[in-house]
Swiss-Prot record:
Name this polypeptide is given: Biosynthetic peptidoglycan transglycosylase
Record flagged with keyword Cell wall biogenesis/degradation: yes
Keyword Transmembrane helix assigned: yes
Species whose genome carries this gene: Rhizobium meliloti (strain 1021)
Biochemical pathway: Cell wall biogenesis; peptidoglycan biosynthesis
Amino acid sequence: MPAGRWTATRRTWRSRRRRLVFIVLSVLILPYALIGLYLLEFIHPVSTLMLRDLVLLRGYDRQWVEFDDIAPVLVQSVMMSEDGQFCAHAGIDWAQMRGVVEDALDGEQTRGASTIPMQTVKNLFLWNGRSFVRKAMELPLAIAADFAWSKRRLMEIYLNVAEWGEGIYGIEAAARHHFGVSAAKLSRRQAALLAVSLPNPIDRTAGKPGRGLRRLAAVIERRAGRSGGYITCLYD
């Protein structure tokens, strides 16, 4: 290959490599910039699943609702079901995480350790499915979100982007779809059913619960009724 042509080829590869590095860095940095942007309470974030539905021309149902317009029994139920230490940790429940790692090293089936901040950043910026790459991105993002946002703002965003059925996002759309009421009017049992459906909202239908889901909801309803000491960061 002539020297001039070889030099041109090298320049082309360097240019492509620089572009690739720029794209990768942009993808990694963008979520942190958005975390800062979402400090502004008039901005209503959307999740990656909502964006997917838009790209696929499916559409979705999401009606943003402010934290104070969500029934406290729903907040209590979600905390007791998904992240009982939400007010105590700084984005990651390290005790739970350590237990998961120990179970994995022992070859045992691992239990969930995703906190509400972790689930929120996953919904906003990442993708579903188990992946070490996703988890490595999720952990620092959860810490950043918990540091930047108030606990009330974090919970508000989480409850407005969580999936509660095919094309159903956010607690207002979920409450109206499954029970025909607003998020402010949910009963204790309805709130518990919505909370326990969160891990698998496609297969677990809050509005038409099976026996197993009703049993889980009864447990969460009892825990929510005793959750006063766990929710001090959200209610005065």
